[in-house]
């Protein structure tokens, strides 16, 4: 498939625009230089492709001009997503997520491959194991993700996580999802039931504020929960 420049979805400054375009170029190369896995287009088990995406994210966040202030604005009601670019062929979408202190995602698996890198501040990633018999997720471990951390995740219940900003200052992360730009809020997250009663009750408390992919539909409801989980990662 011939490379096509992804259309910018907002108006970044020139240095940010150039950095985002370089990231798009690298992602295009990743698609065109690696053979699809058997489950294409999910590419859940395509190690060469995942390594290409990981390298593209690492190089992108090393550029101090990647995100201008317009892409780093937060929201007091829940973490905010800024859609930066979308592939003209619908193969991927790129977003910056801004996490104010105390904000977190729901516990979720993914309908597609995705990757993220921490650009600013520090996130905490909680990892979960899927219990097929119980149809629920159990917490395994928690890992700090400081600026510079890069992760690429496969689709499916083999990779379930939750991201949170447990620090006292803003955090910003860069995400790429294997969906078209128009699907970023509806076809990425796969919300799962959590086994632990405490966490499960927290998820349940916000369920009325989220659609099936964790997209916020009633921010004021989400804001009332003890842990402000919203949107998607
Ligand atoms: Fe995620």
Role assignments for model-derived ranges:
Residues 72-101:
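A short glycine-rich, His/Asp/Glu-containing loop-to-beta-strand
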Residues 191-233:
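Long hydrophobic alpha-helical segments typical of transmembrane helices together
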